[in-house]
Amino acid sequence: RDEAQNMIFELQDKLVEKEYLSAKLYYDLGSYTGNSSYSSTGNNYLAAVVTAENALKEYPYSKKREDLSLLVLRAKYDMAKESVDEKKSDRMRETIDEYYAFKNEFPESKHLKEVENIFKDASKYVKDDEE
């Protein structure tokens, strides 16, 4: 019984790793559309967010939780930066919301400096937009 349980956890870890690598691939592709005949800036960032968030829901106790959450924050931020002006402000606000969620869940993260920089930049944009 214990052996079966351990095997299940081991296989779940492999599935989480696969999901993380898929989300990271989408993130790394960024706004690249390849040979596509239509322009869909940010689509890969959105795919990264969806993939990572699904993995977080499906495997809430994963060791990759922090990495997946950071990937969501980065992807939302980069998507916001590349957004058209009409959507940029809302997407920067989503980035700020994601920052607070990350900071609450991982207050001791080794990525805090990067996360703080994302927050400062997003806040600056939102503040400039409100003036």
PLM-predicted stretches and their roles:
Residues 1-131:
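Acidic, polar-rich low-complexity tracts and alpha-helical solenoid repeat scaffolds
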